[in-house]
Amino acid sequence: MFRFFRHYLSSSAISLFLIETGVVIFVLYYCFSYYLLPELTSGPVVSNILLLIALPAGIISVVIYSTGLYDRWHLDDFKRIANRLVACFVICLPIIIFLFKVNSLEVAAAERLKISFYLLLTASVFIGVLLARIAYLTVAKVTVSPHRVLVVGAGRLAAEIERLTAQHKSRDTEIVGYVNLNKEAAEVSHPKIVTKEGSLLALARELGAKELVIALDDRRGVPLQPFLDARMEGIKVTSYLNFWERETRRLNLRALDPSWLIYSDGFRIGTFTNAFLKRSIDIVASLALTAFMLPMIAVVAIIIRLESKGPLFYLQERVGQNGRNFKVCKFRTMRTDAEASGVPQWAAIRDPRITRVGNFLRMTRIDEIPQVINVLKGDMSFVGPRPERPFFVESLSRDIPFYGERHRVRPGITGWAQINYPYGASIEDARAKLSYDLYYIKNYSVLFDILIILATAHAILLNKGGR
C-alpha cells in the first residue's frame, strides 16, 4: 500500500493497472498496424497509429477500472474477473466501432473493415488483459513478498485486525504475529500469539517484520524505548488507527478520539486552493452534464407523468455544509402520499411507497440527476457525503460521535460511502457510512474525486447501494 495524492492505493492493483493498460495499447497497435499498414501512407506510420488508438485505449482502461477489476480484495477472483471482462467487452465494442468510424485520419481504411475485425480486436484486448493478469499473479506469488507486519497487542483492537485480515485476504500485507506486550486478556487466536523473550526489535527481525502496529487496548505504562529502538533501526511503527485507515480506507469510529483527528495529517479540503478547484470543477461538470442529459430528462419526465399523477420533481429539506438547510431536488420516485403520517421515514429495500418507474430511477441513480441544480447553486458538490434530512441528523448526532464533522464540507451527489457500503436504514449503517465520509474529508484530492466518479459507474452497474 502507498499513498498517491493522499489516497491509499494497493501496490498490486497499481502494478496490474499499468501492465494491463500496456497490454491494451500493444494489442490495439498491433491489430491496427497489421490490418491498416498499406493504407497508412501519409505521415509517420507509428505516430498515425498511436493517434488512432490513444482515445480508445484510454476509454478501455477507464471502463476496466470502472467495473471494479482493480478492487484490491478481488484481484485474483477469476470468476469475477471473467464476468467483468465480458461486461467490458459489451460496453467497449460499440465505442471502438464508433471512434474508429468517425476518425478523420483514415476514413478509407475504416470503410474496408468488417464488423468481424472489431469483434476480434475487442476480444483480443480483453483476452490479453486476462492473460496478463494470470501471468502477473503467477509470477508475483513467487517473486513478490507481502509487507510483513507484527502487531503489538492481543486484546480487542488486535482481534479486530485479525478479523479484518481473515475476512479480506490482501496480497500486499501479511500479519506475522501478535505480541501480548502488557499481559492483556488475549482475544486473538493463541497460535498467532508470539512470545517476546528479549527485545521487541530482535523479535521483529526474527519474524522478518517491516512494520510494528501498536494495537494495545491500554497504552498506559507501556515503555516507549522498544518502539524507539525499532524505529531507529528502520522498522516502521504505526498506530492502530493509522493502520486501520490504510488497510480499510475508512476510519474506525469505535477507537477514534479527538486527539488523533487533531494531530493526524489531512483535512485540507477547506484550503483556498482545494475549495476553489473543487468548486470550479463542479460548475463546469454540472453545465456539461445538464447539456448532455437534457434528452434523457425529457424522456424521464414523460414516463413519470404517465405512471403516476403528481409533480415531476421532489423537493426535500436536507442538511448541508456547516449545518445549513437547503432543498434538494430529485426526480419523484415515490407516491405523493409517501409520508401521509407526517413522520419522516428512511427509505427501505423494496419500499412499497416507491413506484415502478421510481424503482428503476433509483437503481440507476437517474433520480439524482436534477441535483446538478443544487451543485450549480452551491448547496452541493459532485462528490461528498450524502445529505440527510434534519430529523435524522438530529437523532444521529446524538447517537454517533463525530457525526457533525461530515457537515464540514458540501454534501455530494455521490460519495466514498455510497460506492463502498450498501444502502442502509439504521444507526449502525449510518455509523459505517460516516467512517467512509470522514476518510474522504481527511484525504480529499481532485484525483480522489475522479476515482470516486469512475467507481460510481461500477456501483450503478451492480446496483450497489441502490434503494
Give a label for each model feature.
Residues 1-23, 27, 75, 131-294:
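N-terminal hydrophobic signal-anchor/signal peptide
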Residues 85, 89, 145-162, 311-334, ...:
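Membrane-cytosol interface motif
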Residues 391, 398-467:
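C-terminal terminal-structure detector
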Residues 347-410, 452-460:
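A short, structured surface patch at a secondary-structure boundary
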Residues 273-337, 374, 446, 451-467:
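A hydrophobic, helix-centered structural microdomain
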Residues 184-186, 244-257, 314-356, 414-433:
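Short, glycine-rich, amphipathic interfacial segments at transmembrane boundaries or analogous
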Residues 1-144, 274, 467:
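Signature of alpha-helical transmembrane segments in polytopic membrane proteins
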